UniProtKB/Swiss-Prot annotation:
Residues 1-50 are annotated as: Disordered. Its main location: nucleus. SMART domains: RRM. One of its GO terms (cellular component) is cytoplasmic stress granule. Gene3D superfamilies: 3.30.70.330. The gene is RBP47C'. This is Polyadenylate-binding protein RBP47C'. Residues 103-185, 199-278, 306-378 form the RRM domain. Pfam families: RRM_1. Belongs to the polyadenylate-binding RBP47 family. GO terms for molecular function: mRNA binding; poly(A) binding.
């Protein structure tokens, strides 16, 4: 077998920024029927119209039925190939059908003793798997496994075959099955230029049978500049979540597609097209949330705070689900998700790592919803309490606290939605009406 690149424990996860697709159950069930008295005729009540809901979804996570149009899917934020080692394989190398095809598989439910050597042997067969690199994510304090890792293959075809063959199959020397999925970042791809535009669009209402290739073909037939297409899959079932993203190389074609392709059928359903927000904008203006410039100015002057508030979480997101995308950016001290609050807190060891995570993940999709990030308050930074026992807060912290953490809820910018009149505002939060 050809040489395999195995990353050492000392390598920071920053060199290989990899994130898994978030696994989530289906949407919450509809409202139960309302009991009526026997002497009254029984009817089948329907849930109240969305505009009757006057409470912020952060306080009522059970009402958050559908996410707002998500951000550009993470595979489009491509990263430098620091440790990409090619080796020869039998036959011709597979040429990607189009740019952006993923070659990296996320491996979950790893036991503490499962290291890179174990993964290498587990995925190697007589056919000689074309493995490029391996990495088990470890805790920097004690070196223990975080329970997941990544395996990059030479081509998308090989990775796809491994995913189909091994997912759910028994792991060697254990009685547990493999838990595999596509990684959200492909380590073999080149990162987009920081100053380059991210010309992506959101595509919703996709039929269950729509694949990456079909979505790409649907748009590339009319727009030659299409570079990539991605259908978001559920990590547990492997089925489509009903939406995806298409990235263009030409801004004019992207603009035309926003209008011309809206309502066009892909497979058996008409597509719903929406804008995907750029990765980087002034004042952190993001689709699904808008961070006032004042909050960003305050955070720039605070070089000690390393805690990030994460708003807009759905109730099925776990601590581990929240930790995985953030762990790409550096060492994490703690992750907390208050029960029933629709939010969480992630505390980093280093300030620069927290700044990068806030910039890159604000407005991305974690679970089934777009999250809104802002600076929280480190538990060590105590604030005086008012006469009601509440922590003193100023406009930056927004009056929200949990277990010593303070946070603000960024306000959405309705102008970012092409159908703003049809997206009611609940308590200052943008929520999609399905």
């Amino acid at each position: 077998m050809a040489d395999v690149k195995v990353q050492s424990e000392s390598e920071s996860s920053d060199s290989h920024p990899l994130v898994d697709y978030q696994s989530l159950p289906p949407y919450p069930p509809p409202h139960p029927p309302v009991e009526v008295e026997e002497n009254q005729p029984k009817t089948s009540p329907t849930p109240p119209p969305p505009h009757w809901m006057r409470y912020p979804p952060v306080l009522m996570p059970q009402m958050m039925y559908a996410p707002p149009p998500p951000m550009p899917f993470s595979p489009y934020h491509q990263y430098p190939n620091h440790h990409h080692f090619h080796h020869q394989s039998r036959g011709n190398k597979h040429q990607n059908a189009f740019n952006g095809e993923n070659k990296t598989i996320w491996v979950g439910d790893l036991q503490n003793w499962m290291d890179e050597a174990y993964l290498n042997s587990a995925f190697t067969s007589a056919e000689e798997r074309e493995i490029v690199s391996l990495k088990v994510i470890r805790n920097k304090h004690n070196g223990s496994s975080e329970g997941y890792g990544f395996v990059e293959f030479e081509s998308h075809d090989v990775a796809d075959k491994v995913l189909q063959e091994f997912n759910g199959a028994p792991m060697p020397n254990t009685d547990q099955p493999f838990r595999l999925n596509w990684a959200s970042f492909s380590t073999g791809e080149k990162r987009l230029e920081n100053n380059g535009p991210d010309l992506s669009i959101f595509v919703g209402d996709l039929a269950p049978d729509v694949s990456d290739a079909l979505l790409h073909e649907t748009f590339s037939e009319k727009y030659p500049s299409v570079k990539a297409a991605k259908v978001v899959l559920d990590a547990n079932t492997g089925r489509s979540k009903g939406y995806g993203f298409v990235r263009f190389g030409d801004e004019n074609e992207r603009t035309k597609a926003m209008t011309e392709m809206n309502g066009v059928k892909c497979s058996s359903r008409a597509m719903r097209i929406g804008p995907a927000t750029p990765r980087k904008t002034n004042g952190y203006q993001q689709q699904g949330g808008y961070m006032p410039s004042g909050a960003f100015t305050r955070s720039e002057g605070d070089t000690i705070n390393t805690t990030i508030f994460v708003g807009g979480l759905d109730s099925s997101v776990t601590d581990e689900d929240l930790k995985q995308p953030f762990s790409e950016f550096g060492e994490i001290v703690s992750v907390k998700i208050p029960v029933g609050k629709g939010c969480g807190f992630v505390q980093f060891v280093n300030r620069p790592n927290a700044e990068e995570a806030l910039e890159k993940l604000n407005g991305t999709v974690i679970g089934k919803q777009t999250v809104r990030l802002s600076w929280g308050r480190n538990p060590a930074n105590k604030q005086p309490r008012d006469k009601y026992g509440n922590q003193w807060v100023d406009p930056y912290y927004g009056g929200q606290f949990y277990n010593g953490y303070g946070y603000m809820v960024p306000q959405p910018d309705p102008r970012m939605y092409p159908a703003a009149p049809y997206y009611p505002m609940y308590g200052g939060h943008q929520q999609q009406v399905s």
